[in-house]
Amino acid sequence: MEINSIKKDNMIRMNLLYPIISIFAFASSLRFLGYKVAFLVALMILAAPFFAKRKFLTLNLFLIGYPFLPDMITLMGAFAILFLYIVDIYIYKREKIVLSTFYVPVALVFVFILINTFTSLDIFGSLRDFSMNVAGIAIFLAIVTSIKTKEDYNKIATSLAIGAAFVCLWGILQFKFFGTVQREWVDADVSSQISARAYSVFMNPNVFAEYIVLLTPIVVSLFWAHKDGFKKFVFLGITGLLLLSLLLTFSRGGIMSVGVSALVFLFFNYRPLIALAIPFALLGMNFLPESIRNRIMSITNVKDSSTSYRFKIWSITKDVVKDHPQVGVGFGHKPFKETFETYIRSMPIFHAHNTYLQVMAEGGYTGFITFLVVVVVSIVQTIRVIYNTKNTIVKTFACGVLASIAGILVHGMFEDIIYINRIIMMIWIVLALSTSLTTISKQEN
């Protein structure tokens, strides 16, 4: 009775503390964020007790809707969700910290981007990318803390699939009724064949393709793992939406990356299907519209305008890396853009169209090594789950995550995958799924 009384008193004190914290937050953030944002921050803190009791639901709703949210709301939402879990761990004692070896590379990333931000050639320019990556780490920690079983993983992955369905439906509607194409999106030689490209909420078809590359293997793994016929039908439908949207982006890098993802998924999950998948894919090419088929066939054409444009960007970016080899020009795209334009004024670009060159330009060889550590550890831990788990469902989920990582790494050869905030967030989500499966595998074994 005495223990229950103490717990009740603590909860009363905490509930009284929220209004005080919200008033303080409103007053302190009013000057820097403006009235509307400051009011929203205060409102979120006031609502914390309600959402704290439903934090897993809140996390899932965030994962469904965040692609449609403004960056600032996404940022605040990510920190608010982590705050709910921290309160539950340290105040209410309803959650426990889930320990993982992957926290080491995550901590390494945080320390590096913090230093790289404040040693940047444009500190304020770097803060945008720094804050979004920290928000991504916040969601990473929330997901890893919340997923304790394969059922929890299934709920999180299903929320991502539902969000992907909405994003793709909007992309298809946008392509059909509001279709547009900007000059820089299409090669001059084929501009007459492509009158529109799908971009959904991402405002760029290549970025939309990055999102699809990350999500498609996750959704396929859900389809593969579920035995229920209705659920299989739903996930198959979402997979169809993702693949249709990918074709409507006309992103050659995206199509190639999803192809690699498919091979990785089948190699680790069911190798005999590879022999059927490749000829089936080649046969399917004949049924595609001519504009899409020609776009895919142009992958091998290194002389088209967009490819030659990229070659020139890569060449200049290599010069940036040579001139800033140790720690780069600073974290984020703004320091890179400002530095790049000192080399050539006639190419006002935002990034290097290659993640690996971009990372070296921003962070030097130190940043590139940090990036490699995260990539290698995430791949190794996921492969270990595949080979060590005794549960076929967990193995299938892990194959989906590994295929997602492999696909986005391939896509990173043609685009900067850590430039747009929505993609940065999704990458941290995929890393969280990988880490969670490692924990589940160890517990079940």
Go through each PLM region and give its residues:
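Transmembrane signal-anchor hairpin modules in multi-pass inner-membrane enzymes, especially those
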Residues: 1-115, 124-125, 151-154, 158, ...
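Membrane-interface micro-motifs in multi-pass membrane enzymes
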Residues: 32-37, 71-78, 128-129, 200-212, ...
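A membrane-periplasm/extracellular boundary helix in multi-pass inner-membrane enzymes
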Residues: 169, 175-178, 266-305, 315-323, ...
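Membrane-interface helix caps and helix-loop-helix hairpins in membrane proteins
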Residues: 118-127, 247-248, 413-418
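Alpha-helical transmembrane segments of multi-pass inner-membrane proteins
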Residues: 23, 27, 32, 42-47, ...
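Loop-to-helix entry and N-terminal half of a specific, functionally important transmembrane alpha helix
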Residues: 383-414, 430, 434
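A conserved mid-to-late transmembrane alpha helix and its immediate loop/hinge
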Residues: 200, 243, 248, 314-318, ...
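Long extracytoplasmic/lumenal interhelical loops at the membrane interface
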Residues: 185, 300-315, 319, 323-363, ...
